[in-house]
Amino acid sequence: MAAQYPAQMNFLAPRKPEDGPTFYRSAAAEGFETSNFHQEPYSVTVTDARPQRDSFQLDTHGFAFAVDPEGSQPEVLEAIRAGDKETVQKLYYPLVEKLIKDHTGASRVFIFDHTVRRREASLAGKNPNGREQPAGTVHCDQSPLGARRRVYQHLPEEADELLKGRARIVNVWRPLKGPVLDWPLAVMDCTTLQKADIHPTKLYRGRFELRGETVSISHNAGQHWYYLDRQQTDEITMIKIWDSKDVAGHMCAHCAFQHPETPEDAPLRESVEVRCLIFSDE
């Protein structure tokens, strides 16, 4: 039987119908609130996925694991750690593109973003060098509206034609140091996510300048969580963000969590997450 561990995760707090749709506003104009929701911690159980690592499927569970030694070559990892975006795009993006095509059968992959994270216990948001902290709130990066908006944002001339086929967003997450002992990444089995748990959250700037739409997640006791114990740098996690096709694994809520058995001297987690638009003729 796979090992299971207790964890705390932050979910969207219970809401009433009169509260309206959730939103977050950056650089809020005077007199405008930053958000109309808050998060609450819940206790969850996280199961070690390693005994069944190769059984998870993107189109069923919303996530999958894969072994990718090419992307974990020392020179590649060092370039990512150094934060040189041009070098990362030149060295690492082609490897991710090939990986995604091999695992999804996609005819085209467009990488639009990547984030490097290094946990620093004394910081809540970003390190001084701009690297983000692990995300401790349960979320999914894009709603269906936000995802389609991304297609038009990055590929405006081709968007209408591309969206006639199957379109997806998949994030590729990789540790930059292994094994991961500190704040590992947890992913939720999409088959245990209920429609009522999903809350599209508009992202405004200023007053009502729409910048995108993400997804907040509320808690229910039937949700199942997994993580890959002692994940190594050659092991990647693919996270489904959105899928235009009606499949069981249409999205994957995810969150970093504090493992109860993390050694006191564990190296602080470092990771890279690459965000991919994926297109196929289906």
What are these regions (language model features)?
Residues 1-16, 282:
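Eukaryotic N-terminal targeting leaders
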Residues 9-10, 14, 18-214, 222:
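Non-heme Fe(II) oxygenase catalytic core, chiefly the N-lobe of the double-stranded beta-helix
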Residues 213-282:
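Catalytic core of Fe(II)/2-oxoglutarate
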Residues 2-6, 77-79, 275:
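Active-site loop/lid in soluble adenylation, ligation, and acyl-transfer enzymes
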